[in-house]
Protein backbone atom coordinates (compact mmCIF):
# COMPACT_ATOMS: atom_id res chain seq x y z
CA UNK A 1 0.00 0.00 0.00
CA UNK A 2 1.25 3.47 -0.88
CA UNK A 3 0.04 7.06 -0.62
CA UNK A 4 0.28 10.15 -2.80
CA UNK A 5 -0.32 13.61 -1.34
CA UNK A 6 -1.71 16.55 -3.31
CA UNK A 7 -1.88 20.21 -2.22
CA UNK A 8 -3.19 23.01 -4.45
CA UNK A 9 -4.48 26.57 -4.08
CA UNK A 10 -7.46 26.03 -6.39
CA UNK A 11 -9.93 23.13 -6.51
CA UNK A 12 -9.62 22.82 -10.29
CA UNK A 13 -5.84 22.43 -9.98
CA UNK A 14 -6.34 19.69 -7.39
CA UNK A 15 -8.84 17.93 -9.63
CA UNK A 16 -6.47 18.06 -12.61
CA UNK A 17 -3.50 16.78 -10.59
CA UNK A 18 -5.46 13.85 -9.17
CA UNK A 19 -6.99 12.96 -12.54
CA UNK A 20 -3.53 12.95 -14.13
CA UNK A 21 -2.20 10.69 -11.35
CA UNK A 22 -5.15 8.31 -11.74
CA UNK A 23 -4.21 7.65 -15.37
CA UNK A 24 -1.55 5.27 -14.03
CA UNK A 25 -2.22 1.54 -13.76
CA UNK A 26 -3.05 1.55 -10.03
CA UNK A 27 -5.75 0.20 -7.74
CA UNK A 28 -7.25 3.08 -5.73
CA UNK A 29 -8.21 2.05 -2.20
CA UNK A 30 -9.44 5.42 -0.91
CA UNK A 31 -9.19 9.17 -1.45
CA UNK A 32 -9.25 11.55 1.53
CA UNK A 33 -10.07 15.22 0.89
CA UNK A 34 -9.56 18.32 3.03
CA UNK A 35 -10.17 22.04 2.65
CA UNK A 36 -8.41 24.55 4.90
CA UNK A 37 -9.20 28.27 4.99
CA UNK A 38 -7.02 30.98 6.51
CA UNK A 39 -8.10 34.57 6.97
CA UNK A 40 -5.53 37.24 6.19
CA UNK A 41 -6.04 40.97 6.68
CA UNK A 42 -6.77 41.39 2.98
CA UNK A 43 -8.08 38.04 1.76
CA UNK A 44 -9.11 34.47 2.42
CA UNK A 45 -6.53 31.82 1.56
CA UNK A 46 -7.77 28.37 0.55
CA UNK A 47 -5.75 25.17 0.60
CA UNK A 48 -7.24 22.13 -1.14
CA UNK A 49 -5.53 18.84 -0.33
CA UNK A 50 -6.09 15.17 -0.92
CA UNK A 51 -4.42 11.88 -0.11
CA UNK A 52 -4.78 8.96 -2.51
CA UNK A 53 -4.26 5.53 -0.95
CA UNK A 54 -3.44 2.95 -3.60
CA UNK A 55 -1.73 -0.27 -4.61
CA UNK A 56 0.41 -0.71 -7.68
CA UNK A 57 -0.68 -3.41 -10.10
CA UNK A 58 2.20 -5.85 -10.60
Spans of model-derived segments:
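Generic short beta-strand segments
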Residues: 32-37
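Short proline/glycine-enriched turn/loop segments at secondary-structure junctions
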Residues: 38-43
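Hydrophobic beta-strand residues in large extracellular and virion-surface proteins
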Residues: 6, 28-31, 52
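Short, well-ordered alpha-helical segments
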Residues: 3-26
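Localized chelating/binding microdomains
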Residues: 2, 27-30, 47
Amino acid sequence: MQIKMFDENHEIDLEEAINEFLKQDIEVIDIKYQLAIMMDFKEQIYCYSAMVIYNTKN
